[in-house]
């Protein structure tokens, strides 16, 4: 069946030439016809496309190339055909360039396509097909992704459903890792044209894989296979999904799919690489190499080439062909993307094999950057950095290994690596890591702990000072090495030698020198070239003071290794210890002349110290001193340039600055060194020296003392001398003497110490002798010390050490001591005289003190006797008072009985209601009688006031008169009857209205007596002699009955010189002070007649009672205002005891008279109320 034909018009005629597509002639023939007939361009393009469809690409290219030049453009819209011609040819070149393997040919094709697209741009730039072709060309170039994206975007703006543009955008989004966006474009293209080729669904499948939607990806790949059973991409995709399931059946299915893909396209690099990976795990390395090499040569995609090279490299690696493996690993890293780090892992292993740890570290760092928590990479990097000398890298290694041990706590190797890193910085951490490793070995692995680990643990304990633990681990390591020697004798014997050496060092530290020496010599018998043993034996001899023996051991080491720097350094130190500066300097210079040790820090420091030491020797050549300073400074600077953290060099620079006189700068240097480390004793001493030079002696003393405590277990005489010097300059001579004496105990034969002790003794003695306040003991002791200093100086001036001090100076000091001793007798005599005077003065003062003490003792004894006598008198007075009280109580009872008989005839309401209180209303004598109290209360109140004199009683009276009446009235009544006292009204209210009387309980009727107590003495009428019990609180006598008022009126008519008996009846002036005469006359005139003729009304009586009560409280008694009678004066002395006793009783029972007053007032008020009723 004919596919069709095309007509070519003949020139200048109406005829045409018809060419059948099934029988197209050769290209050249067609071109000649087209040229001859001057055929239009669109016919050229149609014929060219037909040739392309039939696979005749050469004719296709020839036709389009000829059409560019010879095509007829003389017709409408020829520009579009012209552009189509150029774009079609360019698209062909782009397609060929994509397939081309040769880089030069590929480059030529791209150049031709670029030229053609540029020419087309000049014709119609914004044609959709032209833009699509140009965008695909940009995608091929790879580095013009954004330009292609812009052109696809432009096309989609004009035609949103343009499928090539949608597929182009999907491709760009996928390459930019925007998998969701790419999937969206694929879906849109599929919706626009559901009949899209299988490649569209293949692209969707890849998007689903990247989005981790594996089931949808499987469906997409399967659908692509349904549409195109030869879609290799879909077969590979499904195969990878099957292989990743890691099950036997899935792996089998995956391999079958790959084989099917290989059958369809044997040159597909993706298929070849996956098959190579499969055969690698089957250990068929020849097939791996064949397939991978074939894949490498069949692709220009670098990612594919990297995969192929990696497969080749690891096949050679596993066959131990490390050179070929290195080559392919390296080539794979050149092609690999940043995410494909497996080649770097293999390459790093190859670098480790070659010993290039730096490049190996870089390779593993790239792997770790892509996979930050990869266990194997961190472990390898940790091991690599652990062996580095760079502390920063060691810190990185520590971090990596800690992460490894956290992720896999049972990894013994990681714990051991971590412990080895921590050995330098964290001994306790290293011990802990070793402990964990040993525990895992014993518990999890069920294996014995290797002797290497035991030796390392012992060494760590040794560094910590745990000598016992260290010995235990060293011995265990030796036992373990002997047991393991059966398997590898040479290796474990070497370990035993190292452990034996460590054990010998331990014995040295434990001061078991004999055992250490024995071990060293045993090692040397088996291994005569073990240089360290010679050095340790020499060091032990040096520490014992056997310098010659030490030198012999060091020379033995030099016979084995003539250029051994440690041996030459130790020999040089022997010379320096003997102050042989020249030979010592030559030894260190010899070390620095060797090429391998020309920058040896220790030797350079030693040379600097030699030049610095020469500055301590006395010299007058300032130029020479300056040269030595500059040389030492230059050496220390060189050391700092080589090692910026060398503290000893910094300390040396500070010392040179101090010698130059720059004390402040030197102090700053020393301070910085001490901040960096406090474990260098020289820095402390240098700081103290600077303080002395700056005259900060207190700080210097503290620094020296701290240095002694921190660094020297025993007394170091050199540092003690520095301390004594600071104390001497500070003026603390006594402390200086004690410090030097301690040093003399350590080094009794040291002549410098002896000189300094003598000098301090001399200065102390001089200061004591010049001080006129010094006592005899101090002066005698100073003379004794001066004699001792003289003997010391005399001895030192003859046999002193000329190298350490000037003997002439000792002789001069001896003469000065002799001069002072010649003047000492004057000072002794002066002190003796002063001492005698002080002794006499002290004796006199002691005598006066003794007299004063005896006088005080005598006065105290007299006072005690007086007090005892007074107490005795008081007791006697109390006894008399008690007797008198008993008599008065008896008398009061008889009087009351008489009064009751006289009042028995009265009647009426008054006698009934007021009768229970009438038994208490007596004459004036009864008013003054005391109320019987409970014995317990009377006794207590009386004893409190016994012994008070009359003046005391008088003061109490005056004081108590100021109390308000209401307060006085409530106490006794409530105390007598038991209930709690009630608050009374203020005095103003009592004046207006008499208070309602409180009723006593029936049990108390007839039992209350007057509380006034009258002295039994007949002649005590004077107010100064007579004291009644209720002193200080005057009575209200106006509250008694009419007969009481009558009796009082009669007493007013009697003379003032009545007998003692009448005065006793009228009451005591002290205990119950009377009203003045004017007041008494008023009472008489107001109350005399009514009491006989009529009964007063309640209101009148209440008024009278309140007025009289107020007057009684405010004034002094009648007897207070009149002079005492002569008879009372004559009996004053005889009655003083009785008066005092009564006064004491009254003042002690202050509540009793108050109760009596209230009783009287209550009785008067009750009478008034009865009458008014």
Swiss-Prot record:
It comes from the Eukaryota. SUPFAM superfamilies: HCP-like (SSF81901), TPR-like (SSF48452). The keyword Amino-acid biosynthesis does not apply. Residues 892-1173 are annotated as: Disordered. The gene is CTR9. Residues 900-912, 955-964, 980-994 have a biased composition (Basic residues). Keywords: Nucleus, Phosphoprotein, Repeat, TPR repeat, Transcription, Transcription regulation, Wnt signaling pathway. One of its GO terms (biological process) is trophectodermal cell differentiation. Its main location: nucleus. PROSITE patterns: TPR, TPR_REGION. It comes from Homo sapiens. The modification Phosphothreonine is found at residue 925. Pfam families: TPR_10, TPR_19, TPR_8. Residues 1098-1128 have a biased composition (Polar residues). This is RNA polymerase-associated protein CTR9 homolog.
